[in-house]
Amino acid sequence: MAIKTEAYVDTSALIAFLDRSDSFHPLFRRLFSSPPPLVTSALVIAEGHGWFLRRYDRNRAIQFLNFIDDLSVLAFQPFDHEELTKTGRLVKKFGDQSLTMADAHGLVIINQRRIATCWSTDRHLGLTGAKLVISPEGP
């Protein structure tokens, strides 16, 4: 089966794009200027909202949600009991890593959808073989 052209987008990529002080901002600004179909976890949206709320304020957190609403190329994978079970298994499989549930759910999605490219600054998201856009080979 052919590898799909969609990419997985992690919290760190969303933050890097929206926060000009992030060292990866130029890379993600370029990538988001013409994005392929993107997919993410519902947990990533919760994590991103929380990051902007804690780091900045309610207004920036709402701006983050508005950006997500306007990002028409972004699809969401819900997080239900079945996803919790799969994600928990992966956290245990990589017990030597400090994986959050959001990161582990991202790995589950990457594997299920056979995604080859991951937009993330978090090297954990490459554990199962997806190419990170920050790697030397680049996007």
Model regions and ranges:
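A generic structural signal for short hydrophobic patches within well-formed alpha-helices
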Residues: 14-15, 45, 125-126
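Active-site neighborhoods of divalent-metal-dependent phosphate/nucleic-acid chemistry enzymes
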Residues: 2-3, 74-118
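Short, well-structured N-terminal submotif of metal-dependent ribonuclease cores
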Residues: 1-40, 53-66, 136-139
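Acidic, PIN/NYN-like endoribonuclease modules and their adjacent C-terminal/linker elements
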Residues: 1-4, 107, 112-139
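Conserved beta-strand segments of alpha/beta enzyme cores
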Residues: 37, 73-75, 131-132
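Structured helix-beta-strand junction loops
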Residues: 34-35, 71, 97, 128
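Short secondary-structure boundary segments
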Residues: 42-43, 103, 122-123
